[in-house]
Amino acid sequence: LHMIHLHWYQYPPMNPIMYPLLLVFMLITGILCLAGNFVTIWVFMNTKSLRTPANLLVVNLAMSDFLMMFTMFPPMMITCYYHTWTLGATFCQVYAFLGNLCGCASIWTMVFITFDRYNVIVKGVAGEPLSTKKATLWILTIWILSTTWCVAPFFGWNRYVPEGNLTGCGTDYLSQDILSRSYLYIYSTWVYFLPLAITIYCYVVIIKAVAAHEKGMRDQAKKMGIKSLRNEEAQKTSAECRLAKIAMTTVALWFIAWTPYLLINWVGMFARSYLSPVYTIWGYVFAKANAVYNPIVYAIS
């Protein structure tokens, strides 16, 4: 109770119907996420033709999503059943840390997947191909930096506290001190604004490069009096473009999933009078659903 911000005490308990609804949602989402990401990992690790450096990033994405739901799913089921957080202060902090860690690792894995697509499509043969060593280094960098940022609240830079709905825990976005707010400013930039800027830049350049390539192909075909110049290399380029569209869709879905949680944090900092416990549930709903999207998108590919 000492970790719950005074802001939440002004609200009555949530409508009891919200808890079974959230429980059912988490049950469905949890099963789909764990099964989907497990299958993704298993297929990529056991199919020799898929064990490429680029697909190591896909496996890392599936692992971060799997780990997120594996650690979030059971506690959420318990708290929804009891209508409040019953797992203690220490586990509340661990729970929030793991959620932030997996979310951070997920988005930066998507950023590196996007950058790899950029390197392949835009730079082509002039670009340095992704090696297993480089992909492994990228993955290690993702997890080390994500861990560094997410462990900071344990040492006094912000803190992990129960959410207003009391079914989960997250960063403290209601405290007014500059130390707590500075963490949220920098962390929001690190896990949202910077990745978004990099992703938008990469895809703008990719779209321009693909458009220029297609125009060149059409112009050359007209000069030669044929319908198409498509050859094996062109078909390969087309396949790379399809992969880029898949990656772009996945990144877009990730941002749709995490934007509500970002807004909750910023509303909590600057306009908390508008923030009720019920609204904080939407951050959970969208963020947890994100872990289901990725295996579906890559299975289609």
From Swiss-Prot:
Topological domain spans for side Cytoplasmic: 44-55, 116-134, 205-245
Disulphide bridges: 92-169
PROSITE patterns xref list: G_PROTEIN_RECEP_F1_1, G_PROTEIN_RECEP_F1_2, OPSIN
Family of this protein: Belongs to the G-protein coupled receptor 1 family. Opsin subfamily.
Residues that carry a glycan: 165
Assembly and binders: Homodimer. Interacts with GNAQ.
Native source species: Orconectes australis (Southern cave crayfish)
Compartments it resides in: Cell projection, Rhabdomere membrane
Cited function: Photoreceptor required for image-forming vision at low light intensity. Can use both retinal and 3-dehydroretinal as visual pigment. Light-induced isomerization of 11-cis to all-trans retinal triggers a conformational change that activates signaling via G-proteins. Signaling via GNAQ probably mediates the activation of phospholipase C.
This protein's GO CC annotations: cell projection; plasma membrane
Cell membrane recorded as keyword: yes
Transmembrane segments: 19-43, 56-78, 93-115, 135-155, 183-204, 246-267, 279-300
Membrane topology listed for this record: Multi-pass membrane protein
InterPro entries cross-referenced by the UniProt entry: GPCR_opsins, GPCR_Rhodpsn, GPCR_Rhodpsn_7TM, Opsin, Opsin_lateye, Retinal_BS
Taxonomic placement: Eukaryota, Metazoa, Ecdysozoa, Arthropoda, Crustacea
Post-translational modification remark: Contains one covalently linked retinal chromophore.
Keywords: Cell membrane, Cell projection, Chromophore, Disulfide bond, G-protein coupled receptor, Glycoprotein, Membrane, Phosphoprotein, Photoreceptor protein, Receptor, Retinal protein, Sensory transduction, Transducer, Transmembrane, Transmembrane helix, Vision
Principal place of residence: membrane
Stated name of the protein: Rhodopsin
Extent of motif 'Ionic lock' involved in activated form stabilization: 116-118
Presence of keyword Membrane: yes
N6-(retinylidene)lysine found at: 288
Segments on the Extracellular side according to the record's topology features: 1-18, 79-92, 156-182, 268-278
Gene Ontology MF: a single term: photoreceptor activity
Example of a GO biological process term: visual perception
